[in-house]
Amino acid sequence: MSQSKPTVNPPLWLLAELTYRCPLQCPYCSNPLDFARQDKELTTEQWIEVFRQARAMGSVQLGFSGGEPLTRKDLPELIRAARDLGFYTNLITSGIGLTESKLDAFSEAGLDHIQISFQASDEVLNAALAGNKKAFQQKLAMAKAVKARDYPMVLNFVLHRHNIDQLDKIIELCIELEADDVELATCQFYGWAFLNREGLLPTREQIARAEQVVADYRQKMAASGNLTNLLFVTPDYYEERPKGCMGGWGSIFLSVTPEGTALPCHSARQLPVAFPSVLEQSLESIWYDSFGFNRYRGYDWMPEPCRSCDEKEKDFGGCRCQAFMLTGSADNADPVCSKSPHHHKILEARREAACSDIKVSQLQFRNRTRSQLIYQTRDL
């Protein structure tokens, strides 16, 4: 029996992917492989109109992301406009291109929160992963400058098989920098990370050791009165049930790409679903009425075993993008789930990780030339 149309609440979190331009070449970047096709970017006025519409709908948090959002010269103006509208604003940055004068301008414009990402705890590995020899010292300097301006000190480390074994040193660096919050996020396999999965996915043993390191540090830090919050995000490739991706399709999160495509999650543009542009439809119409945003809302779309599963209200059938990447159909159950007929895809990935000997230098790095080669090859 068909269920009633699901209740749709406003999007609480808006992510503005301002640009795909970036000075780094991280091989786990979540940007689309064909980002080099996407040269157009919304203008300052167009972005502010997106913010205005989202705020009118009830959005409360706005993240500035990319690529590297610092490449936008109008970033202070965008921050000020968002602040004037009443958003809580968050800058998600590599720190490359950040200066003390820019920090002062952002503070004056009303920026609430800055998150700086690192690739590793040491300069050599950081340079190898970022493709930039000067990145590490710049990140250190800007992390200290952020702290000096009384922003919440939030550091992000993407963990994978090449840096997860230095987790103790990573945490020590965060303590040294007096971080308030540390996101230790094991690589999520979308975009460039999926392309490099065999060379990035940690082994089960590495994950287990990392969990123990985090647990030990939490205990040690609590005993010493250190209030730094360590958030450790494990890869769902070693779980038996999928994550409730984005809190459910089209439930709380709305992303807008550099050229204006509206998406229910960062990776959804790869799906064989037409997603509308903010240049052609209002944000309200896109959120409530568009086919793309309604495609996987509720439960009626679900095949078995999801449809009759007593956990469907918790995980929503898992990740649609992951189902598409691993099975060829976004309608299928997320293969992470042990009930999925495609769970063997996850088991194969685990076996690959256990045997992989791919070095950092052998990864496919995210850059414009590589992106052009990838989509030219796929167009043949």
From Swiss-Prot:
SUPFAM superfamilies: Radical SAM enzymes (SSF102114)
PROSITE patterns with a match to the protein in the record: MOAA_NIFB_PQQE, RADICAL_SAM
Keyword tags: 4Fe-4S, Iron, Iron-sulfur, Metal-binding, Oxidoreductase, PQQ biosynthesis, S-adenosyl-L-methionine
SMART domains attached to this UniProt entry: Elp3 (SM00729)
EC number: 1.21.98.4
Known cofactor(s): [4Fe-4S] cluster
Cofactor detail note: Binds 1 [4Fe-4S] cluster. The cluster is coordinated with 3 cysteines and an exchangeable S-adenosyl-L-methionine.
Catalytic activity: [PQQ precursor protein] + S-adenosyl-L-methionine = E-Y cross-linked-[PQQ precursor protein] + 5'-deoxyadenosine + L-methionine + H(+)
Domain Radical SAM core positions: 8-223
Single Gene Ontology MF annotation: iron ion binding
Pathway(s) of this molecule: Cofactor biosynthesis; pyrroloquinoline quinone biosynthesis
UniProt key word S-adenosyl-L-methionine: yes
One GO term of the biological process aspect: pyrroloquinoline quinone biosynthetic process
Signal peptide start and end residues: none
Role: Catalyzes the cross-linking of a glutamate residue and a tyrosine residue in the PqqA protein as part of the biosynthesis of pyrroloquinoline quinone (PQQ).
UniProt family annotation: Belongs to the radical SAM superfamily. PqqE family.
Protein name, as recorded: PqqA peptide cyclase
Phylogenetic lineage: Bacteria, Pseudomonadati, Pseudomonadota, Gammaproteobacteria, Enterobacterales
